[in-house]
Amino acid sequence: MQSQESGVHYSRWDSSSRDEVSMTAMSSSEEASCYRRISQKLCSGKLGIAMKVLGGVALFWIIFILGYITGYYVHKCK
């Protein structure tokens, strides 16, 4: 099975006066394949490990700041 790419293909026949123009579009399964390829690149190998570490550090700081703000207002002296 051949994968089809989006685009226009123009073919001119020498033996007759017919010209052939064919147009193809990317199917949804090929779009999913593109997203899967990007996901595979970002989530595996050294880049994937770096992304997970950065995501974990960012999540830690978000939770830390939310906890700090919440604790400030809960334990605020009246």
UniProtKB/Swiss-Prot annotation:
Intervals, Extracellular compartment: 70-78
Name positions with the PTM N-acetylmethionine. 1
Instruction: Please give, as recorded in its UniProt entry, the membrane topology of this protein.
Output: Single-pass type II membrane protein
List, as start-end ranges, the regions of compositional bias called Basic and acidic residues.
11-21
Q: Superkingdom of this entry's organism? A: Eukaryota
Compartment annotation: Cell membrane
**Coiled-coil stretches:** none
Disordered as annotated region, ranges: 1-22
Instruction: Please give the residue ranges for the topological domain Cytoplasmic.
Output: 1-48
Role, per record: Regulator of red blood cell formation.
Q: What name does this protein carry?
A: Small integral membrane protein 1
What is the species listed in this Swiss-Prot or TrEMBL entry? Mus musculus
Species classification: Eukaryota, Metazoa, Chordata, Craniata, Vertebrata
